[in-house]
């Protein structure tokens, strides 16, 4: 299965039980900042934005004072799981990033999708990739 298929079929799919509700954008990005696959709507990001996310995954709390920036959008960092999940909020939307052994699984949402639904979609794929040694 291609990385693009993971994005299209597992991240940008309808949310279980909520037909028509899906993430706004999603991507799988290597720890080095290279994009493995992304939705057409995923923002163009700067290398320093991805570096900040990687630093926070290794040093939890790094982004809390400045916020998480992706594609020029600033998200307020909210509770996550140290070294595993970073969550951010902006207005009625937000972002979830799950770190695996080799990649970052990223999902961006807006209402009517809820933070919990975004977390479920992103973390489910991230957990699967971890189980596969990725």
Curated annotation (Swiss-Prot):
Phosphorylated by MAP kinases. It is found in: Cytoplasm, Cytoskeleton. The modification Phosphothreonine is found at residue 114. A motif (Involved in PIP2 interaction) lies at residues 84-100. Occurs in many kinds of cells as a complex with monomeric actin in a 1:1 ratio. Belongs to the profilin family. This is Profilin-3. It comes from Olea europaea (Common olive).
């Amino acid at each position: 299965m291609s990385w693009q298929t993971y994005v299209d079929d597992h991240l940008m799919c309808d949310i279980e039980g909520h037909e028509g509700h899906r993430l706004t954008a999603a991507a799988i990005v290597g720890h080095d900042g290279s994009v493995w696959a992304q939705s057409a709507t995923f923002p163009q990001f700067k290398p320093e934005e991805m570096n900040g996310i990687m630093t926070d995954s290794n040093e939890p709390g790094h982004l809390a004072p400045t916020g998480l920036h992706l594609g020029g959008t600033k998200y307020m960092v909210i509770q996550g799981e140290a070294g595993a999940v970073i969550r951010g909020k902006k207005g009625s939307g937000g972002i979830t990033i799950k770190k695996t052994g080799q990649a970052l699984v990223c999902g961006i949402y807006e209402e009517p999708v809820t933070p919990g639904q975004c977390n479920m979609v992103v973390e489910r794929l991230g957990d699967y990739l971890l189980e596969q040694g990725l």
